[in-house]
Regions:
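Low-complexity, interaction-prone regions
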Residues: 1-2, 88
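An N-terminal amphipathic alpha-helical segment
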Residues: 2-29
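Short, low-complexity, polar/charged sequence segments that are solvent-exposed and flexible
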Residues: 23-26, 49-53, 80-83
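Active-site-adjacent beta-strand anchor residues
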Residues: 32-33
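Short, hydrophobic/π-rich interface segment
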Residues: 36-62
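C-terminal edge-of-domain segments
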Residues: 54-88
Length: 88
């Protein structure tokens, strides 16, 4: 499964484009975010990607979860959004 890592400096439109492409190719993807700014950009990207895919009849569903990760040897908690889709 595609895991797209999102930071607070990520462009939401760029992430949305990558997310929409992953959904078209694989029907599912994941976004991983650490920190409030990154989570904000992720949520905006999901909303934008939903708009990109709606004309094709594709609906997105997002399931958030916590995930323990390591960054530079430090334990951190990430928010992971599992994105699935359904064609209607």
């Amino acid at each position: 499964m595609n895991v797209l890592k999102v930071s607070s400096k990520s462009n939401a439109n760029s992430v949305a484009g990558a997310l929409a492409a992953a959904i078209r190719d694989f029907s599912e993807a994941e976004l991983q975010a650490v920190g409030a700014g990154a989570v904000n950009q992720s949520v905006k990207a999901i909303a934008i990607a939903s708009g990109f895919l709606a004309p094709s009849g594709i609906v997105l569903y997002a399931q958030p979860s916590f995930e323990a990760i390591q960054i530079d040897g430090e334990d951190r908690t990430a928010i992971r959004f599992k994105i699935t889709s359904q064609k209607i």
